[in-house]
Amino acid sequence: FTGEVMNDYTWDISMQWHIADYLTNDCCYLQKPEYTEAAEAFKDTGSFRGQDSLFHPDVVAYYTSSPSVTSHSQFRSLEYTIGGPLKMIPDTDFVAGVQSAEYNYENIYDKQSEVGNVGGSSGNSSANSRDYTALFFESKTSLLDGAGELSVAVRSDDYSDFGKNTSWTVKGLYDVMDGLTLRASVGTGFRAPGLGDLAANTTFSADSHIDYVKCAAQGIARPDCPSEQVNTYIAANPNLGPETSESTNVGAIYT
């Protein structure tokens, strides 16, 4: 929805609502308890369920698994902006607004994967939600009879799961002559941690890596250093805060 106020100002109200549901199915993973049962039976008696091979299709079907993940996510937001001339400062336009949003998700793994019975797979069930409110303002001022331009922007976010953060940017342009423009900017930024990083259950994965330090200690040359699997556990950290950054850019545009 859009409109005008006092002929000089425009306003805009926008809404979003996204829902995503999907199911992921995999095939032919090793079901560890059933495989152990079959392997021990062959070791003791030489057969299992009337078959004389651990790799008979009927036996393989017994100890293989088809893990699945059921996922749901929902995002809703409402944003209101207003813009026009900032009359207290000559030759300046502005845009200001407020945004409110809510996001939630869940990834549900099958029960056998959750308890660690599926070999070679990684992942575990997780669910989380957050909401936030943001206030933002941006202005652009024409300077030096149009030869220069100054932009200022500031945004303040208030997240339900890790608190508040404010970021800002100041940019400037100056046309030195026809075809040559100098520009510079300085600012800060941030990125909120992912919901899975904050709340996912601990996940097991058998990752491959090359340990060059170990090979050097054993006198093995780097090209001959073998790859090996290690047990890896990936856990969430509910105490994560936002990633923050500072940036400065200076440059020229020549055409």
Task: Report the location of each language-model feature.
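Charge-patterned, long linear interaction tracts outside catalytic cores
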Residues: 235-255
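Surface-exposed, low-complexity loop segments enriched in small/polar and acidic residues
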Residues: 2-132, 187-242
